[in-house]
Design a protein with these regions (language model features):
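General secondary-structure edge motif
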Residues: 44-45, 69
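Short hydrophobic/aromatic beta-strand micro-patches
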Residues: 28, 45-47
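A short, structured beta-strand/loop element
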Residues: 38-39, 44
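Catalytic core of pol beta-like nucleotidyltransferases
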Residues: 1-24, 32-38, 50-97
């Protein structure tokens, strides 16, 4: 899946993701860099309204994104990005919405 394909699919389902609590969604990793292979997963992180997201809601967002993209996803909140990698991830991420 190309970067543009992933972004297009996610944007078409922006309302669904927002209903689940996603305020802003970002693509990073191999798909964002245009280096994804057929077996690559899609890496995403998102911002959400504080106090509105628990484990079950996070799983709902992950399942929705995987269904939209038709492939495995690694999805996390911005707050859960590894502190040693956060600056690099944020600098190279592509904002989806």
């Amino acid at each position: 899946m190309t970067r543009d394909q992933a972004i297009s699919r996610l944007r078409r389902h922006q309302a669904d993701l927002k209903r689940l609590g996603v305020e802003h969604l970002y693509l990073f990793g191999s798909t964002a860099r245009g280096e994804a292979r057929d077996d690559s997963d899609v890496d995403l992180f998102f911002d959400y309204e504080k106090g509105k997201l628990g484990l079950f809601e996070l799983m709902d967002v992950k399942e929705c994104a995987a269904r939209i993209l038709g492939r495995n996803t690694d999805i996390m909140t911005r707050d859960s990005l590894h502190k040693m990698l956060r600056q690099t991830i944020e600098a190279t991420a592509v904002r989806v919405f």
